[in-house]
Amino acid sequence: MRFAIVVTGPAYGTQQASSAFQFAQALIAEGHELSSVFFYREGVYNANQLTSPASDEFDLVRGWQQLNAQHGVALNICVAAALRRGIVDETEAGRLGLASSNLQSGFTLSGLGALAEASLTCDRVVQF
C-alpha cells in the first residue's frame, strides 16, 4: 500500500512529529511504500537545520533527513508556512536579502500542490 504523511506539529514540544516519524518507520518496516511527508503549519520546524536537541534526545530533524537519504522519501515543506516561521532555503534567502538559509538538506520547499498530488496518487494519507 502506498502512503503519504502530513505533519502539522513541530519537531519538539508535541508528540505529533515524533509519532509521525515512528509511523513512517513502521510503514517501511512492514513493506509499505511511503512516497512523501508533507510538513504544514508548525510542522515546518522539522526542517530547521539550526535545531539542536540535547545530547540525550533523538535528533528528529536528522532522523527525517536519514529517512529521505535511505528510502527516497520526499520531504516537502509548505513554502508559505515556512517563510512565515523563518525557514528559508538559499534561493528564498537571496530573494529576501537574508544573510543565510536554514533549510535542512533533504527537505524541499513546496506548495500545496505537492500535498494535493500525494492525496491523488497514494492509497492513504495520514495526518499527525
UniProtKB/Swiss-Prot annotation:
Pfam family, one: DsrE
Catalytic machinery residues: C78 (cysteine persulfide intermediate)
SUPFAM superfamilies membership: DsrEFH-like
Subcellular location: Cytoplasm
Class of this enzyme: transferase
Purpose: Part of a sulfur-relay system required for 2-thiolation of 5-methylaminomethyl-2-thiouridine (mnm(5)s(2)U) at tRNA wobble positions. Accepts sulfur from TusA and transfers it in turn to TusE.
Entry-linked PANTHER family: PROTEIN YCHN, SULFURTRANSFERASE TUSD
The family this protein is said to belong to: Belongs to the DsrE/TusD family.
Annotated protein name in UniProt: Sulfurtransferase TusD
